[in-house]
């Protein structure tokens, strides 16, 4: 099967990949696509799978079937009816590119095996969707709170900054962080328990309803595919084609999409978010996930955007990828301790949120003194603390 062969590299390495790598594998690296799990109880050699391979979406190399550790019945099951699902492809690229797909957020948290029991497009309790224009989020679960602080950003297709990498401060969360464009996204309502059996996993067939981000809204009217499939085994391209064939169209037309592309290529600056993103958070996320979001902050400064990206790159200096300008006070302080026989300085670095921005606080201990400094990156904070100590002790 072509869609299985396309994912051959991932499937060969499946047993040696970490949970984080398996999640990232659901987002194609080279171009947007749709990665579907191959369940242990699924029939991937039968006529239904053959029909999928003959479609335009498959021939365009946008459908991938990757191995899974689960049976279809072990998947996270949203409510019987009424849960939402994106009809967009997924993309793993983190560089500047014009793209309307869903993107994963790189973070410092460890993944749990349970987080793989969902599709990136589904509004599940395991997924947290973050629209463009947001730089920080605060999540509360009981008495525990967590800050999701963006540390690297790229230009979204609507020119607003969108999170690429984030630092999790506080209680770790078992959520898959996914970003989307708040100006152009399409969802459907999925009804998962309908008559008929899925031709792949033998689960119940799913039907779909249009959401408010389609033209020609038909609230409550269910549409079904000719091919008997559940939402877990259905490529999103099939759902999109189904809605288009029943008279629905996205609010952003193909002509407008191309105009946005030309504008994106022409405009170098970033647009500051001035709209209320609360409705987008509510539409995209599961109800319980949305209720846990207690605070979020807009990106209100282009200068901060550039500073965050530059500090993210500056951390590469420790790998000798980028030179560090100016005196190296860390080295000078070490030389001073060796020259006079003192114990070498020690450093403590912690992540903090200062004025709504992600920062690092470094404390330098040398002899009987300590200095403290805060900076946008670990290296920056450490250099500043070492500089303060060097100037105090050596002059």
From Swiss-Prot:
- Tell me a Gene Ontology molecular-function term this record carries: RNA binding
Q: Which domain of life is it from?
A: Viruses
Task: Locate the site labelled Cleavage.
Answer: 326-327
Q: Which UniProt keywords apply?
A: RNA-binding
Q: Which segments constitute the DRBM domain?
A: 328-395
Q: Does the keyword RNA-binding apply?
A: yes
Gene3D superfamilies for the chain: 3.30.160.20
| Protein name, per record | Non-structural protein 1
- What species is given as this protein's source? Rotavirus X (strain RVX/Human/China/NADRV-J19/1997/GXP[X])
Native organism taxonomy: Viruses, Riboviria, Orthornavirae, Duplornaviricota, Resentoviricetes
């Amino acid at each position: 099967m072509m869609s299985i062969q396309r994912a051959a590299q991932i499937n060969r390495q499946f047993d040696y990949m970490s949970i984080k790598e398996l999640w990232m594998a659901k987002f194609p690296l080279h171009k947007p696509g749709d990665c579907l799990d191959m369940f242990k109880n699924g029939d991937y050699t039968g006529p239904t799978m053959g029909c999928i391979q003959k479609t335009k979406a498959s021939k365009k190399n946008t459908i991938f079937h990757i191995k899974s550790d689960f049976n279809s019945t072990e998947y996270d099951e949203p409510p019987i009816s009424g849960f939402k699902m994106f009809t967009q492809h997924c993309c793993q690229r983190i560089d500047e590119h014009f793209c309307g797909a869903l993107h994963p957020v790189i973070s410092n948290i460890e993944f749990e095996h349970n987080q793989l029991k969902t599709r990136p497009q589904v509004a599940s309790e395991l997924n947290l969707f973050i629209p463009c224009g947001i730089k920080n989020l605060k999540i509360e679960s009981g008495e525990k709170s967590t800050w999701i602080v963006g540390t690297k950003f790229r230009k979204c297709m609507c020119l607003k900054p969108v999170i690429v990498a984030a630092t999790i401060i506080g209680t770790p969360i078992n959520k898959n962080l996914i970003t989307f464009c708040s100006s152009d996204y399409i969802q459907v309502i999925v009804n998962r328990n309908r008559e008929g059996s899925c031709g792949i996993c033998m689960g119940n067939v799913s039907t779909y309803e249009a959401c408010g981000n389609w033209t020609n809204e038909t609230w409550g009217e269910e549409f079904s595919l000719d091919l008997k499939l559940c939402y877990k085994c259905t490529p999103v391209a099939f759902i999109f084609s189904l809605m288009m064939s029943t008279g629905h169209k996205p609010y952003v037309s193909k002509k407008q999409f191309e105009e946005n592309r030309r504008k994106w290529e022409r405009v170098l600056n970033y647009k500051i978010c001035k709209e209320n993103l609360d409705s987008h958070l509510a539409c995209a996320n599961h109800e319980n996930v949305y209720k846990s979001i207690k605070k979020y902050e807009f990106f209100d400064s282009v200068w901060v955007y550039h500073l965050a990206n530059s500090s993210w790159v500056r951390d590469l200096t420790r790998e000798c990828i980028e030179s560090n300008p100016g005196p190296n006070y860390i080295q000078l302080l070490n030389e001073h301790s060796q020259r006079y026989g003192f114990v070498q300085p020690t450093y403590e670095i912690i992540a903090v949120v200062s004025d709504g921005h992600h920062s690092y606080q470094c404390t330098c201990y040398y002899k009987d003194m300590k200095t403290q400094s805060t900076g946008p990156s670990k290296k920056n904070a450490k250099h500043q603390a070492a500089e303060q100590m060097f100037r105090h002790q050596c002059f």
